[in-house]
Structure formats: structure tokens, C-alpha cells
UniProtKB/Swiss-Prot annotation:
InterPro entries: FAM193, FAM193_C. It is found in: Cytoplasm; Nucleus. Residues 306-317, 596-609, 618-627 have a biased composition (Polar residues). Residues 170-185, 263-283, 682-701, 775-786 have a biased composition (Low complexity). This is Protein FAM193B. Belongs to the FAM193 family. GO terms for cellular component: cytoplasm; nuclear speck; nucleolus; nucleoplasm; nucleus. Residues 490-524 form a coiled coil. Keywords: Coiled coil, Cytoplasm, Nucleus, Phosphoprotein. It holds the Pfam family FAM193_C.
């Protein structure tokens, strides 16, 4: 029919027009309705016949509602295209509300019209509102929109769906009770109704979908399940509308339905939603619409009126909101309930404001789970967005459309819900950012709670735990008591834990005592046999314990010694420099080779506390260099190596190696360590290493004179003096320091060496490994002019060597008499060696980790094995240490490395 004609052409067109003419909603009812009517006619000719019966009177009452697929054949007249409420042509609407249950523009539905609406709905009365319906709806909406603006937030999403349902229902009723009519009327409605008119297309489609899935559902939710798709839906629609005044709750209940209905209704409002209705069985769309409309009516108090006014009321609520935004009947259609409802349902129009709010709920639809349909369709959402009077602006803003669009973009519509609930929300309710204040409040609360808890916990916890009878020490109890305020609960727990621990300890003690008694009994019973067995069995453990305790004590002593040497870092630096210089001098002469060992022995023996590390360095560096550069002009770095040549001697391999052999030394660092072991155990590495103590001590003295004879004699002289001092003075490091001081003066190595020396303590056992790397590096340095580098390298090498050489020195110090004419230094060395032995545990890491000289020392098999093992570890670790050599450049750069070296 004409209405169909309008619907097919105006289904989508109306939607577009509705969007474009959203601002025109007041006028939209009539102009859009013709397309809506055309669409509705196409879609709902059957509806038109059905609607005339139900909506005839309404059509008469509502000539504006004429446009609408729901208009009966008589109502197919394009008086006003289709009314969104009635979706009927003007004629259909003109037929009068009595016929179609539609209210004429000027006519308001009487309160008793609800039965008529029910009948009309059963007869598929048109739901879409004509201009008159829309105007009435707008008025009612304006009145009730403000009242229900708040209620609309939840209900008006339902209202949307209901309004949409009503609109589609009205159009469906107008078209015919046949399902096809309803579906066509839905399309007609959508065609007549501007998509932005009332509900989002998504909402409508959702409403329609849910009604389609169960047309009676919306109706049932409204309390009037749709019967036949056409009739039943109108009935449910009527019931819903009758219930609409109450249904503001229902809208919430119907929100899900509106979600389905609204998308369909957008179909009725806009061609797309209407097609949705069409795809669905008309009956289902109608029930959906009916239920939807009822939902809208329920959401809006006026909806009952709309139901009475051939479901125009339910849509009139939207109409009131939507029509002004929408131009032509399509907007009225979208607000079909509003237009028709306004007349019969002035109170429902307040509900209709809910639908108009429903527009906002369009947004709210997406805001609320119930109103999921609300914002789904951008078009209806616009219509939905307006709350009461805001509806027009909302639809104009097309906030629903924008909301859905923005939602897609991750944004949200500007509806009040979104604004309030923070899609594009204003900042959340201001919360105190005064964290200190909050913290204090929380703290005070916690303190109060703790105070209360201690009272409770004291009584409760005290009852079970009897803190008075606590097993903890008095000090612990006092601490606990004193700290109760801050940690009452914690202390209670801690007290429990402590008690448990004490109990466990007591149990363990009791068990141990019992075991001891048992063992004592056993031992007494089988003590003699057991001692042999147990001793044999326990011997390894005891030996391990003894060795471990000895090593740990030694390690501690070594650590202390290292710390002392680091503390004396400046003097140690000087010593290192002197030792290095001396090593260099010694390196210049072959004798220094032996001298460095004596140096090592002397320095390690004499400076074990400070320079235990240095003495090993001295050994490593002087020996290496003395052996390496006995006759070379590397006296400076020979002095630098002075400590290292002993290493070279200890190594024995680089006797002819030049100072450049710093690299060799480095490579031979492991050999140095092993040779240090040699020096200690096997004398073969060097003559002085044969008798490390005696030879080294003499070699120390020799080294002093030899360095003098070799290049860098002033340093040698100093070195000699320093070595003599070393031999004389228990702390050999200081003489090396004096030697170093000259070399430091001559070379920058003094300060650098201190860092190295400092680091040497750090390096400790690792220094040996580093020593190898140092050896190679410092070797070039020594070969090079910078004694500093050489000294550093040698002292560092010596450091590792020192660790190794120190045991050698200590061991060699004991046999210090052999090669050195100056027996006093030897004797001192020996005494130093003894001292070192005594101090080793506390003085030197080398003492702990470096193998001792096995030759001149009496050892148990266990100790000897331990020493062999140490040597093995040194040999293997040396290489590794070489690989893991420290970046000595940093140390040379940092004079404060001694502390870091620790």
C-alpha cells in the first residue's frame, strides 16, 4: 500500500533522514512517515488491514499516524506517511483510536482506551506516532521526562526497546495481525521512523530480536505476553502499556528484550532495523514490538497510555523525545509511543520521557547491561539519548549514534550515563589524594586495631600461649613487651613462632640428650670396639670439620689480614710499588729471582697482616720477573715485578723471561700458583723454592742488593733497605712499601699499586687467576716505561702470587736460612713465617686457600692432603682466574680500589 510504498522507500531512507533530520524530529513524524508509510506499505500491507481494525479509531484520532505499515488498508492513506506510533497512513490513523487503537493527533487516548489498545494490539494496532501522537508524546515526555529522567537511566533503555516495540507493534498492528504484516510494519516503522528518532538501531534490533525470539517475552515481562504475533503482540503491548506506568522497573527487566527489540525497532524506525523485523517472523517481531513497546510503556509511565492509544503511547514517549529531533513521521515513529501515548497517556509520557531518556539510555543502554540495546544502534541511540526534553538535543547530537560510533572507536557517547559513568566520564568522584593523610588514618586505624587485638590477642593468645610463661629469653620478652605497641599482633605471632621454635629447640635438645645418653650407653657398651670403628668412620668427618674450622679460621684471618693490608692501602701501595720496583730490580738480576722469594717470604711473613697479599704478589711478580728478566734492563719493572719474580721463581718456568713476560707470567699465573705450591711444597721450582723460607729470605736480602745492582739501583737501594726492613720488620709490606714509595715516586705505580694491593686482598685467592692476566698485561706494562703499570701488574700478580707465595713464604720462611747470607732477615722471615702460620688462619686468605709449603713443615696426612688439594685447586683455579682477570686498568685508575678490592 501507500504505507508499504513509504516503508520500502523510507525504511533506510527514513533512517537516514532521521539521522540527518534528527534535529527535525518534531517535524519528522509527518515528512518521514510517508517514506515510512511507503516502506511500511511495502512491508506491512497485511499490517495495514489488521491495524485498521484495531487502530481504526486510533487512526481517526491520529490522522498523523497514517504513515505506518501498521495502518490498516484504510489507514494506508498517506495522510502523514506512517505514524511512528501507528506506522499507519494518515487515513489509518484518522480511522480513530477506537478502530485501530490509535489516537489521532489532537486526540488523547482515554484511560479506558487501554482495552481498546489491547484489542487493537491483538489486531495489530499501529504503534508509530503521527505528528499529533508525537506532539502529545513530546508534551507528555517533556512533562514526564524530567520526572523520570533518573528512572529512565535504567528503565528508559527498556523504554527504548518498549517504545521501539510499541512503534513496531503499532505499525505491525496497523499493517495486519499477520506476522508478515508485523514484519512489514516494522520495516515500515523503520522507514517511517528516523533511525535517530528514538531507539538505536541496535537497540531496536535487539528489542526486535528478543521479541522475535520470544514475542511474548517482552509482553510477558510487561505482564502481558503477546498472543499471536500480531494480535498477541498488541495484547501484550496493551498489557505492557497498561503496565507501562508501573514498568519503569519493567524497562529494566525488559532491557534485555529492548536490546533485541530495539535493534528490530530501529528496523521499524529505520529501514535496517525494520528489515530485521522483517527477517523475523512478523509474529515474533510483533510480539517483540508489543513486548518492546510495553517495556517502553512499562519504563515510561505514559506507556500504558500508549498501549491504550494503539501502542502509540509507548512510542509516543519516544516520539515526545524523538519527534522533535526527527523530522517527519519517522521520528514520530521512532517515538511512536510518545506521539500517541501523549494523548491517552499523559502520565505515561513521563514514562515516555523515560523512553526519551531511553534515548540517553540509548547510551545508557550500552551503559546498562539491561539497556545493552540502548546504545547499540547509533540512530536509535540518538533518539534514546535525549532524556525527556533533552531528547531532542540528544537525538540532534545523535549522541546515541555518536556513542555507538565512539564505542567502536573506543569512545563513548555523550549521553548523561556515559558522562556520569565515565565512558567519556568526568573524573571520578574526587578522592583524597592526600596520601600522607590517608596513610595516617590507616595507621591510626591499624594502631587502634592492634591495640584492641593485643587486648583480645593478649587474652586469647595469652590463654593458649600464656605469654607470662613464655619460654623466650627475658631479653626477648622485654623486647616483645616494649615493642608491643607497634607490633602487638606481629609480636604475638612472633611470640608464637618463638615459642614454637623454643619448643622445637627444646625437643631437639631433649632428643639430642636422649641420643647422647643412648650413644653414651652404646659407647659404654661397645666403646672400645666402637672407638676403632667409629673413629675410623668418624675420622673423615672429624678431619673435615677440623680442616674446615682451620680453613675457615684461616680464611677469617686472611680476610682480616687483607682488610689490614687494605687499610694500610697507602703504605701497602707503596709496598706494592716498592715490591714491584724491587721485583723489577730483582728481575734485572738473576739473584733477585731468589730475592723475590725472600721478598715474598719476607713481605708475606713480615707483612702478613697488611701485605699477606702483597707478599704473594711480591713472590709472583719478583720471581717471575727476576727469572724472566734477570739481566734485563727492566730493573724498574723488575722492581715492580720484584714481588712477582718470586712468582717467576716459584714458577721457575720464566727464569729467562723478560719483563715482557708479564704476559708469560700471566699465562704462567697458574704455574706461579702451582709453583707457589712448588715453593711451598716442591722446592724444585726454584733454589729458594727448594728451601722457600731460607732461600727466599736470603733471596729477599739478595734481592735487595741485587735490585740495587740491577737497573733502578736507587729503587734497589730503597728496595734493599725496604727488604732489609721487611726482613727486619715483621711487616715486610712496609719495606716493600718503602721500596714501592721510591718506585711510586719514580713511577705512578705507587698509587696504582695501592689500588692493586687493595684489590689484591680482594682478589685474594682469585688474584692468582687475575695474576696471570695481570702478568701478561703488566708484563707489557713493565716492558713499557710505566713502572706504574708494571708495578700494578706485578703487585697485582704478586697479589695472587702473594696468596700463593705467602704460603710459600711462610713455608719458606721456616727454612729461611738456606740461601740468604743475611740470616737475620731469614730468621725474621722464619719468625715471620711462624707468625704467619700462627696468623695465617686470621691473617691471610692465602693461608687458608693457598697451599702451605709441605717440605719444611710437619703435617698430618690430612693436612698434607688438604695442602695437595689446595695446590690442585690453585693450579686449576689459577687458570680460571687468569681468564677471569680483573680489569686492572680500572684499578690503576682508581687509587681507592683498595677498599673496593676488599
Amino acid at each position: 500500500m501507500t504505507r508499504r510504498r513509504s516503508r520500502p522507500s523510507g525504511g533506510a531512507g527514513r533512517r537516514e533522514r532521521a539521522r540527518a533530520a534528527g534535529p527535525q524530529k518534531p517535524q519528522a513524524p509527518e515528512p518521514p512517515p510517508p517514506p515510512s508509510l511507503e516502506a511500511g506499505a511495502g512491508a506491512g500491507p497485511p499490517e495495514a488491514p489488521a491495524e485498521p481494525d484495531h487502530d481504526g479509531p486510533r487512526e481517526d484520532d491520529e490522522p498523523n499516524l497514517v504513515p505506518g505499515p501498521q495502518v490498516p488498508p484504510a489507514s494506508s492513506q498517506p495522510v502523514q506517511t506512517c505514524c511512528l506510533l501507528c506506522h499507519r497512513e494518515r487515513k489509518g490513523w484518522e480511522e480513530g483510536p477506537s478502530q485501530n487503537g490509535l489516537v489521532l493527533q489532537g486526540e488523547k487516548l482515554p484511560p479506558d482506551f487501554m482495552p481498546k489498545l489491547v484489542k487493537n494490539l491483538l489486531g495489530e494496532m499501529p504503534l508509530w506516532v503521527c505528528q499529533s501522537c508525537r506532539k502529545s508524546m513530546e508534551e507528555d515526555e517533556r512533562q514526564t521526562g524530567r520526572e523520570h529522567a533518573v528512572a529512565i537511566s535504567l528503565s528508559h533503555t527498556s523504554c527504548k526497546s518498549q517504545s521501539c516495540g510499541d512503534d513496531s507493534h503499532s505499525s505491525s498492528s496497523s499493517s495486519s495481525s499477520s506476522s508478515s504484516s508485523s514484519s512489514s510494519s516494522c520495516p515500515g516503522n523503520s522507514g517511517d521512523w528516523d533511525p535517530s528518532s528514538f531507539l538505536s538501531a541496535h537497540k531496536l534490533s535487539g528489542l526486535w530480536n528478543s521479541p522475535h525470539s520470544s514475542g511474548a517475552m517482552p509482553g510477558s515481562s510487561l505482564g502481558s505476553p503477546p498472543t499471536i504475533p500480531g494480535e498477541a503482540f498488541p495484547v501484550s503491548e496493551h498489557h505492557q502499556h497498561s503496565d507501562l506506568t508501573a514498568p519503569p522497573n519493567s524497562p529494566t527487566g525488559h532491557h534485555p528484550q529492548p536490546a533485541s527489540l530495539i535493534p528490530s525497532h530501529p528496523s521499524s524506525f529505520g529501514s535496517p532495523p525494520h528489515p530485521h523485523l522483517l527477517p523475523t517472523t512478523p509474529a515474533a517481531p510483533f510480539p517483540a514490538q508489543a513486548s518492546e513497546c510495553p517495556v517502553a510503556a512499562a519504563t515510561a509511565p505514559h506507556t500504558p497510555g500508549p498501549c491504550q492509544s494503539s501502542h502509540l503511547p509507548s512510542t509516543s514517549m519516544p516520539l515526545l523525545k524523538m519527534p522533535p529531533p526527527f523530522s517527519g513521521c519517522s521520528h514520530p515513529c521512532s517515538g511512536h509511543c510518545g506521539g500517541h501515548c501523549s494523548g491517552p497517556l499523559l502520565p505515561p509520557p513521563s514514562s515516555q520521557p523515560l523512553p526519551s531518556t531511553h534515548r540517553d539510555p540509548g547510551c545508557k543502554g550500552h551503559k546498562f547491561a539491561h539497556s545493552g540495546l540502548a546504545c547499540q544502534l547509533p540512530q536509535p541511540c540518538e533518539a534514546d539519548e535525549g532524556l525527556g526534553e533533552e531528547e531532542d538535543s540528544s537525538s540532534e547530537r545523535s549522541s546515541c549514534t555518536s556513542s555507538s560510533t565512539h564505542q567502536r572507536d573506543g569512545k563513548f557517547c555523550d549521553c548523561c550515563y556515559c558522562e556520569f559513568f565515565g565512558h567519556n566520564a568526568p573524573p571520578a568522584a574526587p578522592t583524597s589524594r592526600n596520601y600522607t593523610e590517608i596513610r595516617e588514618k590507616l595507621r591510626s586505624r591499624l594502631t587502634r586495631r592492634k591495640e584492641e587485638l593485643p587486648m583480645k590477642g593478649g587474652t586469647l593468645g595469652g590463654i593458649p600461649g600464656e605469654p607470662a610463661v613464655d619460654h623466650r629469653d627475658v631479653d626477648e620478652l622485654l623486647e616483645f613487651i616494649n615493642s608491643t605497641e607497634p607490633k602487638v599482633p606481629n609480636s604475638a605471632r612472633a611470640a608464637k613462632r618463638a615459642r614454637h621454635k623454643l619448643k622445637k629447640k627444646e625437643k631437639e635438645k631433649a632428643q639430642l640428650a636422649a641420643e647422647a645418653l643412648k650413644q653414651a650407653n652404646r659407647v659404654s657398651g661397645s666403646r672400645e670396639p666402637r672407638p676403632a670403628r667409629e673413629r675410623l668412620l668418624e675420622w673423615p668427618d672429624r678431619e673435615l670439620d677440623r680442616v674446615n674450622s682451620f680453613l675457615s679460621s684461616r680464611l677469617q684471618e686472611i680476610k682480616n689480614t687483607v682488610k689490614d693490608s687494605i687499610r694500610a692501602s697507602f703504605s701497602v701501595c707503596e709496598l706494592s710499588m716498592d715490591s714491584n720496583g724491587f721485583s723489577k730490580e730483582g728481575a734485572a738480576e738473576p739473584e733477585p729471582q731468589s730475592l723475590p722469594p725472600s721478598n715474598l717470604s719476607g713481605s708475606s711473613e713480615q707483612q702478613p697482616d697488611i701485605n699477606l697479599d702483597l707478599s704473594p704478589l711480591t713472590l709472583g711478580s719478583p720471581q717471575n720477573h727476576t727469572l724472566q728478566a734477570p739481566g734485563e734492563p727492566a730493573p724498574p719493572w723488575a722492581e715492580m715485578r720484584g714481588p712477582h719474580p718470586p712468582w717467576t721463581e716459584v714458577r721457575g718456568p720464566p727464569p729467562g723471561i723478560v719483563p715482557e713476560n708479564g704476559l708469560v707470567r700471566r699465562l704462567n699465573t697458574v704455574p706461579n700458583l702451582s709453583r707457589v705450591i712448588w715453593v711451598k711444597t716442591p722446592k724444585p721450582g726454584y733454589p729458594s723454592s727448594e728451601e722457600p723460607s731460607s732461600k727466599e729470605v736470603p733471596s729477599c736480602k739478595q734481592e735487595l742488593p741485587e735490585p740495587v745492582s740491577s737497573g733502578g739501583k736507587p729503587q734497589k737501594g730503597k728496595r734493599q733497605g725496604s727488604q732489609a726492613k721487611k726482613s727486619e720488620a715483621s711487616p715486610a709490606p712496609r719495606p716493600p712499601a718503602s721500596l714501592e714509595v721510591p718506585s711510586a715516586k719514580g713511577q705512578v705505580a705507587g698509587p696504582k699499586q695501592p689500588g692493586r694491593v687493595l684489590e689484591l686482598p680482594k682478589v685474594g685467592s682469585c688474584a692468582e687467576a687475575g695474576e696471570g692476566s695481570r702478568g701478561s698485561r703488566p708484563g707489557p706494562g713493565w716492558a713499557g716505561s710505566p713502572k706504574t703499570e708494571k708495578e700494578k701488574g706485578s703487585s697485582w700478580r704478586n697479589w695472587p702470587g702473594e696468596a700463593k707465595a705467602r704460603p710459600q713464604e711462610q713455608e719458606s720462611v721456616q727454612p729461611s736460612g738456606p740461601a740468604r747470607p743475611q740470616s737475620l732477615p731469614q730468621g725474621k722471615g722464619r719468625s715471620r713465617r711462624s707468625r704467619n702460620k700462627q696468623e695465617k688462619p686470621a691473617s691471610s686468605l692465602d693461608d687458608v686457600f693457598l697451599p702451605k709449603d709441605m717440605d719444611g713443615v710437619e703435617m698430618d696426612e690430612t693436612d698434607r692432603e688438604v695442602e695437595y688439594f689446595k695446590r690442585f685447586c690453585l693450579d686449576s683455579a689459577k687458570q680460571t682466574r687468569q681468564k677471569v682477570a680483573v680489569n686492572w686498568t680500572n684499578f690503576s685508575l682508581k687509587k681507592t680500589t683498595p677498599s673496593t678490592a676488599q
